[in-house]
Amino acid sequence: MSKKIKQELENNKLSKRLRHAVGDAINDFNMIEPGDKIMVCLSGGKDSYALLDILRRLQASAPIDFQLVAVNLDQKQPGFPEEVLPTYLESIGVPYKIVEEDTYSTVKRVLDEGKTTCSLCSRLRRGILYRTAKELGCTKIALGHHRDDILATLFLNMFYGGKLKAMPPKLVSDNGEHIVIRPLAYVKEKDLIKYAELKQFPIIPCNLCGSQPNLQRQVIGDMLRDWDKRFPGRIESMFSALQNVVPSHLADTELFDFVGLERGQSLKHGGDLAFDSEKMPERFSDGSEEDESEIKIEPQKAERKVINILANKPKACGA
């Protein structure tokens, strides 16, 4: 097999993997519904480009109709190439809106030199994007955060915030007016890097926040990448943990009624027996099979009807 053919096969595998990962996330969290108008927030980075590209491909084949509109917030950063995004979006035929708001000057004026800008910048952006979604009549706001972003947020909150809290794949805004979705929730960052190279997206670097030294999120990201190299499967296992939460074996008295526990009461996921049910590899080092008596902890899902976004559009009569 020639090197060129082998590379083409790898590229096809990557595209299918990303499509299915995004489709699975959309299905699992019911992110997209018939008639939705989705505002895709486009920053000019690899993640948001990939998000828009994959959603466009799903839109073309999905069994439901939904609209996409790309929105970019021009924060008036010095040297920002204003022509890049309009040129790209017009070339692929996606409706778009460029919102011009000088948040850069606000952040620089309010914060002392050397302070990280992410928190304030994020709050300013969020308010502007919510307002824009309302003006455009959008029903959903799609952000480009991926699996690694979600895990990084989990560790940031544990290390610096004292909370067991990550970044949800789907949420309702504080004012209750907007639904925010993260269709890349199941996607690995390293796959997005490869996809950006494959698609040759016109990447725009963020000089406002990406270049800040000693950024806590960057440190956490480096830690996760190091773990991924040295301990294959660890990142996947950690993300799986976010989908398999056992409140009775944590220590949050608001999440679980420890005070009301009584003898003879059975717990949904077991009492002390749950400590014996740590998931082991499929085969032990001696080659023996895993103990079938292991207690399986499965997430509980609400009963609901969800349209499979990965299914094909129904063919017209006579087609």
UniProtKB/Swiss-Prot annotation:
This is tRNA-cytidine(32) 2-sulfurtransferase. Keywords: 4Fe-4S, ATP-binding, Cytoplasm, Iron, Iron-sulfur, Magnesium, Metal-binding, Nucleotide-binding, RNA-binding, Transferase, tRNA processing, tRNA-binding. It holds the Pfam family ATP_bind_3. Homodimer. Binds 1 [4Fe-4S] cluster per subunit. The cluster is chelated by three Cys residues, the fourth Fe has a free coordination site that may bind a sulfur atom transferred from the persulfide of IscS. InterPro entries: Rossmann-like_a/b/a_fold, TilS/TtcA_N, tRNA_Cyd_32_2_STrfase, tRNA_thiolation_TtcA_Ctu1. Belongs to the TtcA family. GO terms for biological process: tRNA thio-modification. It is found in: Cytoplasm. GO terms for cellular component: cytoplasm. Its cofactor is Mg(2+); [4Fe-4S] cluster. Signal peptide: none annotated. Its EC number is 2.8.1.-. Pathway: tRNA modification. Catalyzes the ATP-dependent 2-thiolation of cytidine in position 32 of tRNA, to form 2-thiocytidine (s(2)C32). The sulfur atoms are provided by the cysteine/cysteine desulfurase (IscS) system. One of its GO terms (molecular function) is sulfurtransferase activity.
